[in-house]
């Protein structure tokens, strides 16, 4: 009976966090709109080999993540949930691996369930795991590789070892097809400390080549197909997307070495109070083979991405699966022997919730700011934000009422965030970051447009996905589409600011021409260097400028 209650509880937890509220959140640009449109175009064109964005070649990532996203939109439709279905599925599969691996390491069902709940309730896992980017996919393949390598090294027969290494190669191959060669570097770096401390070099050298073979065979069919269709894909993807992004001085998303320290701290909420003890206990018990293995998979990728020039919070998502297992193991030890860390965790959650309540007031219409984040007519959004932090503080307090029994309710601290964040986004944010909001407000003007031009790739992708058309033209700025626009067959998909007046004269009689521009809030649109328009509609950061045939 207790098992049934646990099962019902975990399904209710998943529904409240990962299923029910997802459709209430509009897609964010540039990331979610980009991946939504790439997958929509894949379904519309039937081309499952070469990724395209706005009808242009888009070589920033390989294909596997787009496949999963496309299946999500195929199953659930071109809606907010359909766009995010793939990442949610990947996150839940990763959680299932956490359950299985924890159970295999410690043979404790309660610990396995706790590790799963901790993983799914970690702030960074929830934030990225419900956000349509490719990182939850690569995190799944890396965690699957972590499990596969352990299976291989614990097997007692050559068949078991061979199967484990072959499976490892498949996970690495799918990782390469999802986000590139990092899927090879991270597993190698993560297993080396464990192999060294356990002196298991012999098995690695005898069977490791099987992983190499299965990895190559996994990538080969699509790798050859894309090379035949687009011979310069691999050169661009390797040099620009790997070397320049991570290693060179002009790397994208440059950040200092310590960048991930605050990410780890914030990402570990609502279990932050357990983090120091979990890492310390793991290090103290490093003679235990499983603990060393989990520590290695937590720390080595973190060090690798810290050394890299380019950094984003999403890069270290895979570190939180082994960390969740360490947190769960330490939590049960603390509950049994010394609940001080559990009390500290409760107070941290109370402090976080109270701080959020105060911060919400400061930036609300009734606070001291001259330009509040929310306007007076958005008061319901302020109350939603207050509810988010109030629930966080409440469950933090509840864990302290009988800490030995109630500490696990910290998993419910983000419940308000999950249910209400979609209703609390200020209009001023939505108008700049949610193209869907803009499209809904200007649907009648946009729909009949013969040509639509915009100066933002993220907005262009949002317009394309919402309007179900891939012929959006870039205006003034090429952004990440620069490479695709250089192809001869992309001629006419970009109009510079200097060319716009002549281009407008040439195409005006063909139908309505709509220009969608991103502007500063205090920018005077009358000062824009464009021909006089027939209609102008402004939504804070986005402006619709329309020209009708004469």
UniProtKB/Swiss-Prot annotation:
Catalysed reactions, as listed in the record: 4-amino-4-deoxy-alpha-L-arabinopyranosyl di-trans,octa-cis-undecaprenyl phosphate + lipid IVA = lipid IIA + di-trans,octa-cis-undecaprenyl phosphate
Subcellular location as annotated: Cell inner membrane
GO molecular function, one term: mannosyltransferase activity
Keyword Cell membrane appears in the UniProt entry: yes
GO BP, sorted A to Z: lipid A biosynthetic process; lipopolysaccharide biosynthetic process; protein O-linked glycosylation; response to iron(III) ion
Keywords assigned by UniProt, alphabetized: Cell inner membrane, Cell membrane, Glycosyltransferase, Lipid A biosynthesis, Lipid biosynthesis, Lipid metabolism, Lipopolysaccharide biosynthesis, Membrane, Transferase, Transmembrane, Transmembrane helix
EC class: transferase
Lineage: superkingdom: Bacteria
Pathway: Lipopolysaccharide metabolism; 4-amino-4-deoxy-beta-L-arabinose-lipid A biosynthesis
Keyword Cell membrane: yes
Gene Ontology annotations for the cellular component aspect, listed alphabetically: plasma membrane
EC number(s) per entry: 2.4.2.43
Functional description taken from the UniProt entry: Catalyzes the transfer of the L-Ara4N moiety of the glycolipid undecaprenyl phosphate-alpha-L-Ara4N to lipid A. The modified arabinose is attached to lipid A and is required for resistance to polymyxin and cationic antimicrobial peptides.
UniProt cross-references to HAMAP family, sorted A to Z: ArnT_transfer
UniProt similarity note: Belongs to the glycosyltransferase 83 family.
Entry protein name: Undecaprenyl phosphate-alpha-4-amino-4-deoxy-L-arabinose arabinosyl transferase
Organism the protein comes from: Shigella flexneri serotype 5b (strain 8401)
């Amino acid at each position: 009976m207790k098992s049934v209650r646990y099962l019902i509880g975990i399904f209710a937890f998943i529904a409240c966090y990962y299923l029910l509220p997802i459709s209430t959140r509009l897609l964010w640009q540039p990331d979610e709109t980009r991946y939504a449109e790439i997958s929509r175009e894949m379904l519309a064109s039937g081309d499952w080999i070469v990724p395209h964005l706005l009808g242009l070649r888009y070589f920033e990532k390989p294909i596997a993540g787009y496949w999963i996203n496309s299946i999500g939109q195929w199953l659930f439709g071109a809606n907010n949930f359909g766009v995010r279905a793939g990442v949610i599925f990947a996150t839940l599969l990763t959680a299932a691996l956490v359950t299985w691996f924890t159970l295999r390491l410690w043979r404790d069902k309660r610990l396995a369930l706790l590790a799963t709940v901790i993983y799914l309730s970690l702030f960074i896992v929830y934030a990225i795991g419900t956000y349509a980017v490719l990182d939850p996919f690569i995190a799944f393949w890396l965690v699957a590789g972590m499990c596969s390598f352990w299976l291989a090294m614990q097997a007692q027969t050559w068949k078991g070892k061979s199967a484990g290494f072959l499976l490892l190669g498949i996970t690495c191959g799918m990782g390469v097809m999802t986000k590139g060669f990092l899927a090879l570097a991270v597993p190698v770096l993560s297993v080396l400390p464990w192999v060294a401390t356990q002196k298991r070099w012999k098995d690695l050298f005898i069977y490791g080549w099987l992983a190499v073979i299965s990895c190559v065979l996994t990538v080969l069919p699509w790798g050859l197909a894309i090379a035949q269709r687009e011979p310069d894909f691999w050169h661009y993807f390797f040099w620009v997307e790997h070397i320049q992004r991570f290693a060179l001085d002009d790397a994208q998303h440059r950040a200092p070495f310590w960048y991930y320290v605050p990410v780890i701290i914030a990402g570990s909420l609502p279990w932050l109070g357990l983090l120091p003890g979990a890492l310390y206990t793991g290090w103290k018990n490093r003679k235990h083979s499983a603990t060393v293995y989990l520590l290695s998979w937590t720390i080595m990728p973190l060090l690798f991405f810290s050394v890299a020039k380019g950094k984003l919070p999403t890069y270290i998502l895979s570190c939180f699966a082994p960390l969740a297992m360490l947190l769960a193991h330490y939590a049960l030890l603390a509950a049994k022997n010394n609940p001080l860390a559990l009390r500290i965790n409760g107070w941290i959650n109370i402090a976080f919730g109270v701080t959020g309540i105060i911060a919400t007031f400061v930036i609300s219409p009734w606070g001291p700011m001259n330009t509040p984040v929310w306007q007076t007519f958005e008061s319901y959004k302020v109350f939603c934000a207050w509810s988010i932090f109030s629930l966080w503080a409440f469950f933090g307090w509840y864990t302290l009422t009988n800490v030995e029994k109630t500490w696990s309710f910290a998993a419910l601290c983000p419940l308000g965030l999950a249910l209400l964040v979609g209703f609390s986004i200020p209009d001023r944010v939505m108008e700049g970051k949610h193209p869907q909001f803009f499209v809904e407000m200007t649907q009648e003007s946009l729909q009949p447009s013969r040509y639509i031009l915009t100066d933002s790739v993220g907005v262009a992708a949002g317009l394309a996905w919402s309007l179900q058309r891939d012929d959006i033209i870039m205006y003034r700025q090429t952004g990440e589409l620069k490479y695709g626009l250089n192809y001869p067959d992309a001629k006419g998909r970009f109009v510079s600011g200097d060319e716009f007046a002549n281009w407008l004269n040439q195409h005006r009689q063909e139908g309505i021409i709509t220009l969608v521009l991103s502007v500063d809030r205090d920018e005077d649109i009358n000062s824009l260097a464009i021909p006089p328009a027939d209609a102008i509609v402004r939504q804070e950061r986005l402006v619709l400028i329309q020209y009708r045939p004469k």
